[in-house]
Amino acid sequence: CEIPFETLDDLSGKMPNLRQQMMRLMSGEIKGDQDMILLLSKKNAEERLDVFIYNLSRRFAQRGFSPREFRLTMTRGDIGNYLGLTVETISR
């Protein structure tokens, strides 16, 4: 579902709780982007993969699923592209 910005802006002006929730969500997205930039620029391959798996585990737990056992639906190539690593590095 897509809501035009103007409509969302008008609604959030009339509903302070909506504005607060939007700010919280946007803040979380910005923080996630900053964390990814740090991950890609400062961490070695093993640390990148560790953080990736940890974050997946945390997200599964937040949604009520097992944080210890889950299926990775991404291919090794997809994970490598996401983390800036080669498929060979991911396979090790």
From Swiss-Prot:
Transmembrane segments: none annotated. Its main location: cytoplasm. GO terms for biological process: regulation of DNA-templated transcription. This is Anaerobic regulatory protein. It comes from Capnocytophaga ochracea (strain ATCC 27872 / DSM 7271 / CCUG 9716 / JCM 12966 / NCTC 12371 / SS31 / VPI 2845) (Bacteroides ochraceus). GO terms for molecular function: 4 iron, 4 sulfur cluster binding; DNA binding; metal ion binding. Keywords: 4Fe-4S, Activator, Cytoplasm, DNA-binding, Iron, Iron-sulfur, Metal-binding, Transcription, Transcription regulation, Virulence. It is involved in the activation of genes necessary for anaerobic respiration. It probably also activates genes involved in the production of virulence factors. Its cofactor is [4Fe-4S] cluster. The gene is fnr. GO terms for cellular component: cytoplasm. [4Fe-4S] cluster binds at residue 1. Induction: By anaerobiosis. It is found in: Cytoplasm. Pfam families: Crp.
